[in-house]
Curated annotation (Swiss-Prot):
This is Aspartate--tRNA(Asp/Asn) ligase. It catalyses: tRNA(Asx) + L-aspartate + ATP = L-aspartyl-tRNA(Asx) + AMP + diphosphate. Its EC number is 6.1.1.23. ATP binds at R221, D222, E223, Q230, E481, G533, I534, D535, R536. The gene is aspS.
Amino acid sequence: MRRTHYCGELNAKNIGEKVYLSGWVHRIRHHGGLIFIDLRDRSGIVQLVFDPSISKESYDIADTVGNEWVISVEGKVRKRPEGMENPKIPTGEIEIEVEKIKIENTAKPLPFNLWTNKEIDEIVRLKYRYLDLRRDKMQSNIIFRHNFILSIRNFLAKNGFIEIETPYLIVSTPEGARDFIIPSRLQPGKFYALPQSPQLFKQILMVAGFDRYFQIARCFRDEDLRADRQPEFTQLDMEMSFIEVEDVFTIIEELFKTVLKEVMNIEINTPFPRLSYEDAMNTYGSDKPDLRYDLKIVDVTNILKDLPLEFIRSTIEKDGVIKGIVLKNIVPSRREWSIIENKVRELKGKGIMWFTYADGELKSSISKYLDENIKDKLIKNLNLKSGDSFFCIAGTWKDVVKILGILRLEVAELFNMEKKEGLFFLWITDFPLFEYDEEERRIVAEHHPFTSPKDEDIPLLDTNPLKVKAKCYDLVLNGTELGSGSIRIHKKEIQEKVFNILGITPEDAKKKFGFLLEAFEYGAPPHGGIALGIDRIIAILTNSNSLREVIAFPKTQSGTCLLTGAPSEVDPKQLEEVHIKVVYPEEKKEED
């Protein structure tokens, strides 16, 4: 039998037609001397009817099949009897009167119920991924992903972008996360790395004159995993020549506007709002704020700085700050204040000062230190109304905004605050070019070493590099960073200066990035771009809790594939061919 239709595409217009269908047995029912089978393929479900008066042979075969068996059938489309229609499915008006059936394959009893509404153990789901992927939600996610990427490709092609593949086997440049490395058989002792991003190659493509590049790129990072990380992931990688930051914003905003309308029929407003890095940290305590909550951080340093409290005096002497969050129409209980207090201490804060305002009176955990003048200033500056509360903490700017950024979301959850519905995009701009890493005790790149400093800050590279702002930007959606981009350095002397500040010696720079530096000497145009995480975008748009829900074959949090058993040991001969000897850590030796 040769399939003529997909199951889910049949409807009343097909009544009277002979069809050939193939798929999986979704459900079996015996009723009134007939057998009903719901046949499923990726397009949906259609009802088959086996009537012994029409084909006794087909009826007898149908009586032997089980759930998830694979069958093919030949039959005629007919209207369902009146009152037996199913408006919940697209094929609910019709059914197939089966004349012939062929069993293509049987199925063992399933290790889990594919169609339960209960949560299924994820370990079992990942081990039997081929079964898990049959489930409606998983099929829907993967097909949505395909449609989303297809729409991206079409949009970019129409806007003059060329899709170009860059190498997977590259030179290792371990400046960010760890590289996955691959030994070379032909050159003993040398290694390739899998790309963490196509960054250098896309810049080279701009030097080569391709002007507008994109790629749906596979990237690899050997790092500790969380729910929002995978060792291999997919990003939309883009680069453009002769552009400024505004050009990147415009094309990305238009891309999302077009793709979301085409794939989801969602209208979004553009341009997206923008916040500088400093404003985002001061207002939300995060460089990826979730704008679905209205909670904002407020500064009360000037109001409380003169209080006769040792920890405040110490904070002010060290140029610290006092910041907090107003809780509108909320008066926390003692237990709730304790929860907030404990969270602050868990985050290495010094505790909280709390205030509640009711019936014209401001009460506080530090009431005895507050005179009427300070109380009035707090009420006025914080716009407190009866039934409002406020808490604040003191410390260094960096510590305070970080703690409050986390607390902002914890408090919203604690008090079940209303979260606005919709997609809230936001550009974060004006990042510092460098930051000081306390653990490594050195200056490191805030994003990566190829980001251009702002033109007006270039002189600061020689005098005060930590004050230099970058032509850099992040795109945030509902509190998740979708990706980063920047205008790149395109002049050799500035790139060398940045390398020097980062402690990359001329010898190391030549060894790792010599091809890029040399390319800059052959007419490199101004250029910039962005990389957006496809997996994260799809997870948000499908309301998925984990990236594993939107990737066909993901890894676990320990980086393993439960389906195939990767990573695995290899044949000693394979190791010998690439001149590798495995030296196990002590704990592995003890296990053996």
